[in-house]
Amino acid sequence: RRRAMDNLAHAMPHLSEGERHDLAVRSLESMFQLFMVESVATPRLVTPTSWTSHVTFAPSHPLLQRALGLLLERRPVILCTGHCGNWELLGFVMTMLGFDMTALARPLDNPWLNRWILGVREARGLRILTKWGATEVVQDILDRRGRVGFIADQNAGDDGLFVPFFNRLASTYKSIPLLALRYEIPVVCGYA
């Protein structure tokens, strides 16, 4: 909660302390509901015949048409999302629809919870790589014209690339742009 309050103070200094507190509480509640409740329900509710009841899809949007075109071309692509919307649903639905996907993830600190969420993530075929030491595996996937997904809004630590974000510098992964440049491949950003 302290981290959320500190981040909100930097990002939204115009809000009062009480407004920031309320926003932090609502945000944490939403994250919990999204992660725990929706992740439990997703494999049961979102199926090849019911997914359109749970996912809004705008195939006529020009950017989405371009992204789908890249995915259908069977060429290597880097996909990025953040901790916004329902990132778990995004990977689940993409693999359920037949897109071959591998995603990088940080293991959860709780081993039981980590095993459970891996089962949910892999239920429809999403392959999960532990983000630490995955460089060679990611390069092999891209060499084979595969797709790799990143949740790009995580702290990359002291070795990351520092970029301006809500009035201060934040560390993000250098690997995403470096891989895109090395392989001359597109980076597709989106959310669910």
Predicted regions and their residues:
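Short amphipathic alpha-helical segments and helix-helix/interface helices
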Residues: 64-68, 91, 117-118, 138-139, ...
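Membrane-anchoring hydrophobic helices of lipid-metabolizing enzymes
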Residues: 1-81, 114-119, 123-125
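Anion (oxyanion) recognition and catalysis
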Residues: 71, 95, 122, 142, ...
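Membrane-associated lipid acylation/remodeling enzymes share a hydrophobic transmembrane-juxtamembrane segment
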Residues: 99, 133-192
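Residue-level detector of family-conserved "landmark" positions at structurally sensitive sites
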Residues: 18-19, 104, 131, 190
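Amphipathic coiled-coil/heptad-repeat helices and related helical stalk/stem segments
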Residues: 60-64, 113, 131-135, 172-173
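Catalytic core of membrane glycerolipid acyltransferases/transacylases, capturing the structured
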Residues: 43, 75-132, 155-170
